[in-house]
């Protein structure tokens, strides 16, 4: 293990009790380790062009054995359980304390964000937003992720068509 890596918190107990015949569990860069694991919780959404809404969410940042985590998010409408949004990608370390989030959405978008990792928080600024010809006219996205104890919170801002960058989503999840 190098000085920038550690076991994911979700895997540290299992690694301590593994036998010599069990392959080692994937390592996670220490700056990303607080994010590793499965998270479940709730969120709220608002935007000037739509009605406010509430949702449940499951997010996973899964160790891969490389200096990045596989990312997956699935949301459902609160109450009915109807599927809403999903996205997947990778959270990777690109410097000692700089992370990059790569996201693909089935709505026709791919995003690349970069930001500093500081005390369990990543402020992510958009580097690239690509859209398929049929995707909605989203012009900019900004994200913030924070881990405090067993809680993951995030916020997302979006600029869409003629609406400037506006707070759109807030989620609060607990480590599963």
UniProtKB/Swiss-Prot annotation:
It comes from the Bacteria. This is Peroxynitrite isomerase 1. Binds 1 heme b group per subunit, that coordinates a highly solvent-exposed Fe(III) atom. A motif (GXWXGXG) lies at residues 37-43. It comes from Rhodococcus jostii (strain RHA1). Heme-binding protein able to scavenge peroxynitrite and to protect free L-tyrosine against peroxynitrite-mediated nitration, by acting as a peroxynitrite isomerase that converts peroxynitrite to nitrate. Therefore, this protein likely plays a role in peroxynitrite sensing and in the detoxification of reactive nitrogen and oxygen species (RNS and ROS, respectively). Is able to bind nitric oxide (NO) in vitro, but may act as a sensor of peroxynitrite levels in vivo. Transmembrane segments: none annotated. One of its GO terms (molecular function) is heme binding. Keywords: Heme, Iron, Isomerase, Metal-binding. Belongs to the nitrobindin family. Pathway: Nitrogen metabolism. Its EC number is 5.99.-.-.
